[in-house]
Regions:
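N-terminal ordered "arm"
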Residues: 4-48
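Exposed beta-strand and adjacent loop surfaces of beta-rich binding modules
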Residues: 13, 43, 70-72, 118, ...
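Autoprocessing Asn-cyclization modules and mimics
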Residues: 67-117, 122-128, 138-139, 143
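Generic marker of residues within folded, mature protein domains
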Residues: 36, 63, 122, 136-138, ...
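Oligomerization/assembly interface segments of phage tail-like spikes and tubes
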Residues: 33-52, 182-198
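Small/polar beta-strand repeat architecture
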Residues: 5-19, 83-86, 95, 110-111, ...
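Exposed alpha-helical structural elements
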Residues: 54-58, 147
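Short amphipathic alpha-helices in soluble, non-transmembrane regions
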Residues: 58-66
Length: 198
């Protein structure tokens, strides 16, 4: 990995998409069958406000340093990387060998709203970002089971830390060609298209 994407200037707009490979077939009788293969990944498409050369140059230099699609890097999309809940405490994975679409956790402050559906989280030791799919609060002991998508790509270690604020996405550029536009105003226009990598 080759660093963290610059945080200034911030994205003017951000489009996030979830990509999940699913095969669907329908028989003559109308019966539908579906199956999933491969893993889910996030795609982030961001555009910047018009920038001066001094603002734009460090961003474009970072992009060029990725050598097209070769390198991966970390990006923290400010608009979505901090959740709508009020998590507090020292959250950890509670037990090894977890699989599936839920996380058993502990170490939260007691009886608080941790996540709202649509929040993101990340587990130490893994580059994958997960979305919380249902509101969740901690119980009186500071424990919580969190519903997530996609399913865990690897079983997290017991006591692995959980990142719930400023969640970093590990991404790579989606194209080898990176183009900007400028004109007589001296302002630069730029968009970047990234996809999650593990």
């Amino acid at each position: 990995m080759s660093g963290t994407f610059p945080t200034s200037p911030a994205f003017q707009s951000l489009a996030v998409s979830s990509n999940q490979s699913t095969f669907v077939s329908r028989s003559i009788s109308g019966r539908r069958q579906s199956r999933q293969i491969g893993g889910q990944y996030w795609r982030l498409r961001a555009s910047f406000p018009p920038m001066t050369r001094a603002q734009f140059a460090p961003i474009y230099a970072f992009v060029i340093a990725q050598r097209g699609r070769y390198e991966s890097f970390s990006v923290i999309p400010a608009v979505i990387s901090t959740g709508q809940g009020s998590p507090a405490g020292t959250p950890l994975i509670d037990g090894a060998s977890q699989t599936g679409r839920s996380l058993v956790t502990d170490g939260w402050n007691a009886s608080i709203v941790l996540f709202k559906a649509g929040d993101y989280l990340k587990i130490a030791g893994n580059d994958k970002v997960y979305m919380v799919t249902a509101d969740v609060s901690s119980d009186g002991s500071g424990d919580a089971t969190i519903a997530i998508e996609p399913a865990l790509v690897a079983s997290p270690a017991d006591d692995a830390a959980i990142t719930h604020s400023s969640v970093p996405f590990t991404v790579a550029l989606r194209a080898g060609v990176q183009e900007f536009a400028t004109g007589t105003t001296g302002l630069f226009q730029f968009e970047i298209d990234m996809e999650e990598v593990l």
